[in-house]
Amino acid sequence: VEEWKIAKTWVLVHDMGSPWAVEYFPWAYSEPEKGRYDFQHADLVVEYAYAEGITILARVDFVPQWARPKDTTTRYLDKDRFSDFGDFIYAFVSHFRDRLRYFIIWNEPNITAEWGYRPVSPEDYTELLQIAYTRAKEANPQAIVLVAGLAPTLEGEQSEWGMSDLLFLQRMYAAGAQPYFDALAIHAYGGQLSPDDPADPDRLNFARAELLREIMVRHGDAAKPTFITEGGWNDHPRWTKAVRPAQRNAYTLRAYEKALDEWPWCQAVCLWAFRYPRPAHSYSDYFTFVNADFSLKPIYLEVQRYAHGR
């Protein structure tokens, strides 16, 4: 990505009124060979965000070719390579010790597409989390380590596609995850439902975040915060899971209000997605706040008015 695009993106994030942002730092980009680190691009991203006063939640995954078997996806990491990921976390957290504090370990490990198209395993992810947490704290004891945002899904334990986010988190606790994270990342998509649609284990909606929070409380983690690191609504004119643009605007602002007024345990709401580097030419383009050419969408202007009016 050209430097001017990085700079412009962070200016727009700041001007919209957002103090937080989730940024993706692919492991493969910064460690193309074992032990050879290249943080040049990551440095640009962090420096421009820092200049605009934005606090970054750094998501780290994307396995380099040298750390996985041939013909596997960038989400495939064997257990005997978990220590390589831990080494990278140590190097990454050390490098950004004075500039980054929040680190999200992996992404949606409860669905097979994000776990290398293998059966998902809360126990294996807990082992990976333990290694990453330990190495992050070695690099910076003040680092805040977040459990990966889990994909909201109703899949059962034996599904070929994944596992319910609620069940996955419960099994993580059973596997001993509690000492190895400081906060929980949550993915809170609304579908076609209002943010005030009540939480229900058999329903996917924005308020499902409350059910994940209840699991934390039951396991003695009431003092740990959560961060919504993905979520929101889509306003594609023909996608079956989309809402109208006016609904998207209203639901988004109500989601911010709900988190502020009703969820003291939620420290930030970061919705998907600010901007894509290029058009996807599909429904996913209608999750963004800013077009690839940097033109502003109505949702951006609505959030900007809301943020500056509080």
Locate each region found by the language model:
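A general structural detector for well-ordered alpha-helical segments in enzyme core domains, enriched
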Residues: 8-13, 38-48, 85-95, 124-132, ...
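Aromatic-rich peripheral "rim/lid" segments of glycoside hydrolase catalytic domains that contact
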Residues: 33, 65-67, 81, 95, ...
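Boundary/entry segment of secreted carbohydrate-active catalytic domains
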Residues: 1-24
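Substrate-binding cleft and catalytic face of glycoside hydrolase catalytic domains
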Residues: 16-37, 41-159, 191, 222, ...
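Noncatalytic carbohydrate-binding groove/subsite architecture in carbohydrate-active enzymes
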Residues: 82, 86, 120-247, 279-300
